[in-house]
Amino acid sequence: MKSLLDLFKQFTPDEHFNAIKIGMASPEKIRSWSFGEVKKPETINYRTFKPERDGLFCAKIFGPIKDYECLCGKYKRLKHRGVICEKCGVEVTQTKVRRERMGHIDLAAPCAHIWFLKSLPSRLGLVLDMTLRDIERVLYFEAYVVTDPGMTPLKKFSIMSEDDFDAKFKEYGDEFQAKMGAEGIKDLLQSLDIDGSIERLRNDPTGSELKIKKNTKRLKLLEAFKKSGIKPEWMVLEVLPVLPPDLRPLVPLDGGRFATSDLNDLYRRVINRNSRLRRLLELKAPEIIARNEKRMLQEAVDSLLDNGRRGKAMTGANKRALKSLADMIKGKSGRFRQNLLGKRVDYSGRSVIVVGPTLKLHQCGLPKLMALELFKPFIFARLEAMGIATTIKAAKKEVESGTPVVWDILEEVIKEHPVMLNRAPTLHRLGIQAFEPILIEGKAIQLHPLVCAAFNADFDGDQMAVHVPLSVEAQVECRTLMLASNNVLFPSNGEPSIVPSQDVVLGLYYTTRERINGKGEGLIFADVGEVQRAFDGGAVELNSRINVRLTEYIKDKQTGELVPSTKLWETTAGRALLSEILPKGLPFENVNKALKKKEISKLINVSFRKCGLKETVVFADKLLQYGFRLATKAGISICLDDMLVPTEKPGIIEQAEQEVKEIAQQYTSGLVTSGERYNKVVDIWGKAGDEVSKVMMAQLSKEIVTDRHGQQVQQESFNSIYMMADSGARGSPAQIRQVAGMRGLMAKPDGSIIETPITANFREGLNVLEYFISTHGARKGLADTALKTANSGYLTRRLVDVTQDLVVTEQDCGTHSGYLMRAIVEGGEVIESLRDRILGRTAADDVLHPENRSVLAPAGTMLDEDQIDELEVAGVDEVKVRTALTCETRFGICAKCYGRDLGRGGLVNGGEAVGVIAAQSIGEPGTQLTMRTFHIGGAASRAAIASSVEAKSNGNIGFNATMRYVTNGKKELVVISRSGEIVIHDEHGRERERHKVPYGAVLAVKADQTIKSGAILANWDPLTRPIITEFAGKAHFENVEEGLTVAKQVDEVTGLSTMVVIDPKHRGSAKVIRPIVKLIDASGNEVKIPGTDHSVTIGFPIGALVQVRDGQDVSPGEVLARIPIEGQKTRDITGGLPRVAELFEARSPKDKGVLAEMTGTVSFGKETKGKIRLQITDPDGAVWEDLVPKEKNIIVHEGQVVNKGESVVDGPADPQDILRLLGSEELARYIVDEVQDVYRLQGVKINDKHIEVIVRQMLRRVVVENAGDSTYINGEQVERSEILNTNDALRADGKIPARFTNLLLGITKASLSTDSFISAASFQETTRVLTEAAIMGKRDELRGLKENVIVGRLIPAGTGMAYHEARKVRENMDDTERRAIAEAEAAELAGQAEATEANEGAAAE
């Protein structure tokens, strides 16, 4: 019977649509939606509470108030369904139709729709080719517009004031027509000839760029009107639709008052003004009165649609702006973000979390009361099935009474039914995980300690929410995809997320440390059991060095079987005991060392790769238990004597104070400028602080002990504080330094460093001044945290929005393009090894052995750990890999180009939403870091400035192609190139390290010289930038005039004077003159650049201190001037987050550098006022020139040859320039490197591929250069996949395809310009997006995730992908196939029903 009842349920399958189209409604359409005209402004009768007839809540128009009952009560109940009562005119039906039936208002005068008028750019203005100002004057009855000039010389579309109109009317009489208000605009729109206009615009010969741009916009709009069949005059409303009353409810409050939606107020005003206007028109009232009323009506309609967009917002009784229709859908509390994307969830609860150290990784403790409430429906069903309760009501009673049988059933129901735990803020996918619940007493949820890292949870009062998956499918998904034991790696970098922390680390570290001369040192044991007995009996200490025979199981590479191998190990008792819990296949050497946090992480990683997921999870749990037990036994705690203040501290501080005094004297005697003094003081104190912390760590970390033979030896200290920091359990050297060293330099809130440091530490205590200074830093930390959390959240939101529709849609796109990857080396150190960069990527070409050219990895293999080991042995130093950016899949990405799914460890699965994962991986650490700025307490963590580079390895010196240098008078080699690099090769000629060498550095090595590691390669003055001459001659100054371009600074002690170049802004006159020096040779001529007829000209930049005198002889490599470098600010991610946002928004930097537009020779043309004319001539003689402001630093000189895309003016690069000149590969490299720099500074690891995915989305649109035979317009922006599909079709027909260029959009722009208007509207600028979409008559294909969430379907990713594919298959079937399937299903059902009946019959007998 039950199955029969299900047939009557209203079933609305979501199969019925596969796209959503938006458009503009014609008056006929609005009337067809309507169930009647609303004529009166009344709502309900205040005595009877029944709706007034023809009013805003009229039951006749909108439907009955009670289910199946008319208003007057003549017809009641289901039997009269569909009857229309003749007395009150109400149809007898369900009351829910009041949510869907619309009404309408016939406007007495047309009104323009404010969205098409005021949403910029004004669509009405574009269509009519009039300015917004003019249209507004017409609409609000301040001016006339000529709608039909007749035979007069007047122009159509021309605007005239009232006086003009009167004059013209006297002159021409009725020969022309001019109107005011929306009627005039409507006439113009109606008379618009769209085809003719399109023809005219396409053939417009204009050359002005502005005109072309405007024409393109108009053309696009008119084409859209033509294509979508929307008539422009519909932008002016004649009929206004009325929202169904239940969507703008009127709710009685207690005390006889009513709460109402603002919309009712707005509608009421429209209706009032409309009726009044209608009456005035019937009475033939004077024009001026009617005109005023029409204006008021237009304003009322404006307010209803979008209150406050024009003029003052309409306010209610309480002076608050009323919420209009537009406000209902936009913003955080609008329809999209509040109700469609952010729904609240049933079957959920929340509570405080406490630690559950006894749980297994896949379990959580759920309070009994909570479980009872959450699993109620399951319990009811079970009670009914067992026959304990006959009805749901009885079952409810049973549960409420809490009988023992209920608890038994609860246990049964909960068994193997996973629940989801979520901790807000959910910053990445590990913020929600599934666990199997274990019933516990109490009211707090118990959480497994190892998942805390993923949730970022601690137990200081955090709360978590529980959600119950109801359907079987949901439970299966929870178990397979979301169970905590299936999510052991971070999706952002592939590192394990279940790494122990704090106490556990401390316990494991203590166990695996060795102590010299511990009890039982040197004993030899036969097996671990013996060690255990000896340890229990007290014969041997945990940390004693002993020898043990151990058996380990190693996986054979060929067969993959575990082979036992036994040998005698030198180890400690603790490590031997720990070996018991190692999974088979994990070598003992992995734990035969002091286990710090990093080592433990590595251990779990190795276990995952070698032994698989299941073993690793079990191992992690055992490790946890072991660590807790031993941390308890170790009894490590903190005491005051552990904080050792180094004895050398007073000496170091005294010396620093001495140095600071010297600098102060130099300053008073004028040897150094104020800025230099500040820099040097900060530097001295920075070094002193580091020195103190060095001595302190040396003292803390080592202790002298006596070994077995009575010798004094040094061993690592067992100082508690040192062990906590060293193991990575808690604290860091930076924090210990503040406790036992000196606090050091503090930062002001603006990031600059206070030059008086805090010399005390917390153990000694701070004095009042020091305490006051330190509050500065603390306050900055707190303020930062609050502000940055919001910023970071917004960044994540933009990232998710731009990538949400990127899903793995196919296995292999078959491309052979990719990027060459090599290790990132900076300052001679390998920052990121080649291994880290290519792990889990697919090789684009065969990887060959560098010596014998044999294939190590064929193209298309995913490089895993073992293969990369082979590559490293062979010495491969660059590999071409496929990337997200070179993938050729349309509308998605292929698994091969993406490579390994970092969160699972294998090739990425089809349907994985890699876009969202990338966004989370980049956004999550942003938030994490900003929440952590204040942990260093503002202690300035500035790097001491480098002043030299030294070799890290032995090898041969080589210079890169751009390195240039001259020999100066002292026979030193002085670097005169900006991008010179020293490269060190090993004996095989492989590059080992690469060092950037700044301009003005003195080289300590020559090319092809062999050096040992540690040798100095080059050194320079870190606090100034020099200006150097490359040629010899006599210095001849031009425009170097004291008081005009330079100022004299006299040193009082020595009487020497230096000249400083003044900033043009501070000069009284001569703002455009640039001080320069030329060189004169022996015969009195100007020295020329060899091979050209340009004279050598060297400019002095602003703030330069001139080092030579006029007429002095200079030799090559001599310093002519030096520029002091400004003070350093402290760096923390605060600077970093906006930097990341800036990169992803592809903003042009403020003082951006200039890149060479082509390859050629540099020359300087005639200077203009305040600017230098920089020219580049290519070999064919074409010239490109740029005017550079004089204050900019030009880093090329006359006659230099530059390559296209090389920097010619100093400054940060503009991503748009990089894309245009160097292509998308270089751009991607630039963005990836810059973003990684920011995160690397904070020690955060993110895989490059996530950033590449974002860049792919930033490059997903292109600009049409030449439309060919396509329907595109030149200059139009199109989705890349779409234009590629179009071009394929055109080529197939033998037509000319469209040509296009790459376009780089920032993430906000890219999100808004997506083809899906639903996604764009729910992101930002809702009004503008919807206006545009409506005019274009856009179709949303519902490709992305967001659109599908909004329309309430499964997302086309993951398990939803299969559902969508099946749907497509069903859609492509013809009706006969469909009918056949339906009939087969029906027959099967019938068969089942008969079988059931037969069974029941048999049972009855």
Curated annotation (Swiss-Prot):
GO terms for biological process: DNA-templated transcription. Zn(2+) 2 binds at C813, C887, C894, C897. Mg(2+) binds at D458, D460, D462. GO terms for cellular component: DNA-directed RNA polymerase complex. GO terms for molecular function: DNA binding; DNA-directed RNA polymerase activity; magnesium ion binding; zinc ion binding. Its EC number is 2.7.7.6. Its cofactor is Mg(2+); Zn(2+). CDD domains: RNAP_beta'_C, RNAP_beta'_N. It comes from the Bacteria. It catalyses: RNA(n) + a ribonucleoside 5'-triphosphate = RNA(n+1) + diphosphate. Zn(2+) 1 binds at C70, C72, C85, C88. Binds 1 Mg(2+) ion per subunit. Binds 2 Zn(2+) ions per subunit. Gene3D superfamilies: 1.10.132.30, 1.10.150.390, 1.10.1790.20, 1.10.40.90, 2.40.40.20, 2.40.50.100, RNA polymerase II, clamp domain (4.10.860.120), RNA polymerase Rpb1, domain 3 (1.10.274.100). Keywords: DNA-directed RNA polymerase, Magnesium, Metal-binding, Nucleotidyltransferase, Transcription, Transferase, Zinc. DNA-dependent RNA polymerase catalyzes the transcription of DNA into RNA using the four ribonucleoside triphosphates as substrates. The RNAP catalytic core consists of 2 alpha, 1 beta, 1 beta' and 1 omega subunit. When a sigma factor is associated with the core the holoenzyme is formed, which can initiate transcription. Belongs to the RNA polymerase beta' chain family. This is DNA-directed RNA polymerase subunit beta'. The gene is rpoC.
